[in-house]
């Protein structure tokens, strides 16, 4: 008996399986399904299996929600499925893969930039406070 997964895992003519994001939702309210699909199929078209979901807009608690079926993702990667760049980043943030070095570098740059902005803002308020004290006396 031939298993269905072996048929799906074999490279079909003209492409391979890819784990990627399929756009859903409506205008100004995106929602993504994480799917295993053939790379030649359209972004929102037919897929082999849905592996999770991703809501990029923060909820009332400021959280972006991601649901992943890591066992099935591991299965499809074992079958030879490729990952899209956004999925590599998402799985890196989830701890499934190591983070890309540029993500770490960008986070450090952003942290330094925000610290510098806070420092400049505090210096500006201190300077304004001393100016108002000098004019009052």
Swiss-Prot record:
SUPFAM superfamilies: Ribosomal protein S16. Residues 1-34 form a transit peptide. The keyword Phosphoprotein applies. It is found in: Mitochondrion. GO terms for biological process: mitochondrial translation; translation. Pfam families: Ribosomal_S16. InterPro entries: Ribosomal_bS16, Ribosomal_bS16_dom_sf. Keywords: Mitochondrion, Phosphoprotein, Primary mitochondrial disease, Ribonucleoprotein, Ribosomal protein, Transit peptide. The modification Phosphothreonine is found at residue 130. GO terms for molecular function: structural constituent of ribosome. GO terms for cellular component: cytosol; mitochondrial inner membrane; mitochondrial small ribosomal subunit; mitochondrion. Belongs to the bacterial ribosomal protein bS16 family. Component of the mitochondrial small ribosomal subunit (mt-SSU). Mature mammalian 55S mitochondrial ribosomes consist of a small (28S) and a large (39S) subunit. The 28S small subunit contains a 12S ribosomal RNA (12S mt-rRNA) and 30 different proteins. The 39S large subunit contains a 16S rRNA (16S mt-rRNA), a copy of mitochondrial valine transfer RNA (mt-tRNA(Val)), which plays an integral structural role, and 52 different proteins. bS16m has a zinc binding site. It is linked to Combined oxidative phosphorylation deficiency 2: A mitochondrial disease resulting in fatal neonatal metabolic acidosis with agenesis of the corpus callosum. This is Small ribosomal subunit protein bS16m. It comes from Homo sapiens. The lineage of its organism: Eukaryota, Metazoa, Chordata, Craniata, Vertebrata. The gene is MRPS16.
């Amino acid at each position: 008996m031939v298993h269905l997964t072996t048929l799906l895992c074999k490279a079909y003519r003209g492409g391979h399986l890819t784990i990627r994001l399929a756009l859903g939702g409506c205008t100004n309210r995106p929602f993504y399904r994480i799917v295993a699909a053939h790379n030649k199929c359209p972004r929102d078209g037919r897929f082999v299996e849905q592996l999770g979901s991703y809501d990029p807009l923060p909820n009332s608690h400021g959280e972006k929600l991601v649901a992943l079926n890591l066992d099935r993702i591991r299965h499809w990667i074992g079958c030879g499925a490729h990952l899209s760049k956004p999925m590599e980043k998402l799985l890196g943030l989830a701890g499934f893969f190591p983070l890309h070095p540029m993500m770490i570098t960008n986070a450090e740059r952003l942290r330094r930039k925000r610290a510098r902005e806070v420092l400049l803002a505090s210096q500006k308020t201190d300077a304004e406070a001393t100016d108002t004290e000098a004019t009052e006396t």
